[in-house]
């Protein structure tokens, strides 16, 4: 295909010297050649800054930004401020992509007059030998408007990742990544989709997502685990002017509150537990009267609102089993 459109690919780099070469090589070797590759060194303390500079010397399409450490969102925002492309893509620096990913995404986007094009991704464990069928004769779906936002909030948070997508640049004119949170992709996609965009989605697997043991998503329960509640709370509040979308946002927000409430009961984190219980109680009437909420969710909301001691007991028995039963018998 002709390649007049410039695609800017933003790659935040931090403590990934083991993986960086494989990542950048997969971008440099794309079949679509009209690329601007922006490596954002986010104050990495290892050999990554020098590796980025070496890559820039090898390929004139590569630009390097060196900055103080500010986190993933800060690095992506620095790339957005510097990029000049007609389209924008994101690749995490420990991941890699299929050789034709960006040519494929641009092609299906143009054919379907879409603002965003999306492919599937596969989660890879370190040292795995998974072979992926990345054929292009895959199922395509076109989504837009309310339907797109509802799909985003109803899926798990991986629905909202940025790295398996190609965006028209103008979508970021008023959107930046929120700093200081770990679920920044979902929130940024929400504000992009709120611009009434059209998205074409393909079932072709073009992106390889490395699941590292020390990655943010690979770590155990922590304070940052609650970021998903902040993100879905903000999305819910922002959608209050659209009853159809708000109902789905509320359902997802309460569902996550219950998931983390259960975890807090098991870990005996009373402060957070009370906050989440209060959120469930606050919206209990809306959930119990909602036509889109299933009986299981309504039952849990009822227990938390009206019979919380029983709910705590049920959670503890499920999590700690015989130890809880012994205490009751005593």
Residue ranges and their predicted role:
Residues 1-230:
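Nucleotide-sugar donor-binding/catalytic module of glycosyltransferases
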Residues 186, 246-255:
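Alpha-helical scaffolds flanking conserved acidic
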């Amino acid at each position: 295909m002709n390649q007049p459109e410039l695609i800017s690919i933003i790659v935040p780099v931090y403590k990934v010297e083991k993986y960086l070469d494989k990542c950048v090589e997969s971008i440099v070797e794309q079949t679509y050649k009209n690329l601007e590759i922006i490596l954002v060194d986010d104050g990495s303390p290892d050999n990554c800054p020098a590796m980025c500079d070496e890559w820039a010397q090898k390929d004139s399409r590569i630009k390097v930004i060196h900055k103080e450490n500010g986190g993933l969102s800060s690095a992506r925002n620095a790339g957005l401020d510097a990029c000049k492309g007609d389209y924008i893509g994101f690749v995490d620096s420990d991941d890699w992509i299929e050789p034709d990913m960006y040519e494929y995404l641009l092609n299906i986007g143009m054919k379907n007059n879409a603002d965003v094009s999306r492919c599937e991704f596969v989660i890879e464990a370190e040292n795995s030998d998974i072979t992926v069928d990345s054929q292009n004769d895959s199922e395509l779906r076109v989504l837009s408007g309310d339907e797109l936002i509802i799909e985003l909030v109803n899926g798990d948070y991986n629905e909202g990742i940025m790295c398996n997508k190609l965006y028209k640049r103008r979508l970021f004119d008023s959107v930046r990544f929120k700093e200081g949170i770990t679920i920044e992709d979902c929130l940024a996609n929400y504000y992009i989709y709120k611009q009434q965009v059209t998205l074409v989605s393909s079932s072709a697997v073009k992106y390889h997502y490395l699941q590292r043991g020390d990655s943010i998503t690979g770590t155990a329960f922590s304070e940052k685990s609650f970021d998903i509640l902040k993100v879905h709370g903000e999305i819910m509040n922002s959608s209050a002017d659209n009853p159809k979308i708000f109902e789905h946002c509320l359902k997802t927000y309460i569902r996550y509150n219950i998931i983390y409430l259960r975890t807090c009961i098991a870990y005996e984190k009373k402060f957070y537990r009370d906050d989440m219980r209060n959120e469930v109680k606050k919206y209990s009437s809306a959930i119990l009267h909602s036509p889109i909420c299933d009986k299981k969710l309504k039952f849990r909301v009822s227990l938390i609102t009206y019979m919380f001691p029983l709910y705590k007991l049920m959670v503890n028995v499920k999590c700690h089993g015989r130890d809880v039963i012994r205490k009751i018998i005593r």
